[in-house]
Amino acid sequence: GKIPIGAIKKAGKAIGKGLRAVNIASTAHDVYTFFKPKKRH
């Protein structure tokens, strides 16, 4: 059967939102670890 274009667009938008959320989360984590006082050995 043919997949409707609307379904593909909806899936693409959902994936895009998920990737953006992951990017924001990893960036926030990087910033947090950068500013967190490091334990000196």
Curated annotation (Swiss-Prot):
* Induction or repression: By bacterial infection.
Keyword Coiled coil present in the record's keywords: the answer is no
Which GO biological process categories is it annotated with?
defense response to bacterium; innate immune response
Which GO cellular component term is one of those annotated? extracellular region
The lineage's top-level taxon is Eukaryota
Per UniProt, subcellular location reads as: Secreted
InterPro entries per the record? Moricin_fam (IPR009456), Moricin_sf (IPR037043)
Indicate the quaternary assembly. Monomer.
- Name listed for the protein in its UniProt record: Virescein
Species of origin: Heliothis virescens (Tobacco budworm moth)
Instruction: Identify the taxonomic lineage of the organism of origin.
Output: Eukaryota, Metazoa, Ecdysozoa, Arthropoda, Hexapoda
